[in-house]
């Protein structure tokens, strides 16, 4: 049986990366929330 999580660095950064977040208004809100919370890492 094939496992559901097949890691790929490229796919990961394209969907959850910093530039993907900055591309949309809501993504920027995500980053702002994480900055406000004091997250060490903002995005993948």
Curated annotation (Swiss-Prot):
Key word Ribonucleoprotein present: yes
Keywords assigned: Ribonucleoprotein, Ribosomal protein
InterPro entries xref list: Ribosomal_bL34 (IPR000271), Ribosomal_bL34_CS (IPR020939)
Transmembrane region(s): none
MF (Gene Ontology): structural constituent of ribosome
Similarity annotation: Belongs to the bacterial ribosomal protein bL34 family.
PANTHER family associated with the record: LARGE RIBOSOMAL SUBUNIT PROTEIN BL34M, MITOCHONDRIAL RIBOSOMAL PROTEIN 34 FAMILY MEMBER
Protein name: Large ribosomal subunit protein bL34
